């Protein structure tokens, strides 16, 4: 039985649970796949060329995380699915010697929501994950607003039909989503009092970070607001990615059950 190498590309990367859940699937489904896959955490220098790194490492597939999702979009030979709309790639697969980019963050996020009847969302941040979420939520009919500290990247969201802000907008939002890297630095993405104001009129606080009670989620808990971390999104997007890695031999629902059992 042959070996194939996969990984997750990011900086930082040591916090990632992707190797744990993907390796569980590769071990479980090796007979169906006809190969044993091994999935590594790969720390890349910030200036890395994603395609060159992928090819030089001899990878068959990879996930892409902070801060490389938009850069990965730019270097693929082909882009498929919703990644075409959201300008960000979190899944790379070598298909017929071409580097093909997908985005499973978008659907992964939506599937992870325990309720689906939200009308509006405020996304904090403007990076690759924020783009994917905005595309998916707009597609589902939500009114989406984006708040970022600078105007960098906001053109994309304006073209998508989102309301964009660099200072805190007035109003209430059903969903408050932290798509910034603030939680990885143990910080709040917004001034505490401003965030409190939003939380008091919100229905759910969602942080894309996972594995610990972030300052963002801790504040929501303090205010008795329902909250959710990024664990569910991680497992859904990973299972959707695994379906791509397996050339659709293993459905995402089968992969999801294995991943959920180990994390």
Curated annotation (Swiss-Prot):
Active site residues per record: 69
Residues annotated for shikimate binding in this entry: 16-18, 65, 90, 105, 210
A single GO cellular-component term on record: cytosol
Gene Ontology biological process: amino acid biosynthetic process; aromatic amino acid family biosynthetic process; chorismate biosynthetic process; shikimate metabolic process
Entry EC no(s): 1.1.1.25
Catalytic activity: shikimate + NADP(+) = 3-dehydroshikimate + NADPH + H(+)
Record: residues binding NADP(+): 125-129, 208, 230
Keywords in alphabetical order: Amino-acid biosynthesis, Aromatic amino acid biosynthesis, NADP, Oxidoreductase
Coiled coil: none
SUPFAM superfamilies named in the record: Aminoacid dehydrogenase-like, N-terminal domain (SSF53223), NAD(P)-binding Rossmann-fold domains (SSF51735)
Enzyme class: oxidoreductase
InterPro entries reported for this sequence: Aminoacid_DH-like_N_sf (IPR046346), NAD(P)-bd_dom_sf (IPR036291), Shikimate_DH (IPR011342), Shikimate_DH-bd_N (IPR013708), Shikimate_DH_fam (IPR022893)
UniProt-listed Pfam families: Shikimate_dh_N
Any one Gene Ontology molecular-function term assigned to this protein's record: NADP binding
Pathway this chain belongs to: Metabolic intermediate biosynthesis; chorismate biosynthesis; chorismate from D-erythrose 4-phosphate and phosphoenolpyruvate: step 4/7
Task performed by this protein: Involved in the biosynthesis of the chorismate, which leads to the biosynthesis of aromatic amino acids. Catalyzes the reversible NADPH linked reduction of 3-dehydroshikimate (DHSA) to yield shikimate (SA).
Subunit structure: Homodimer.
Similarity field: Belongs to the shikimate dehydrogenase family.
Matching NCBIfam families: aroE, PRK00258.2-5
HAMAP family: Shikimate_DH_AroE
Name of the featured protein: Shikimate dehydrogenase (NADP(+))
Organism: Helicobacter acinonychis (strain Sheeba)
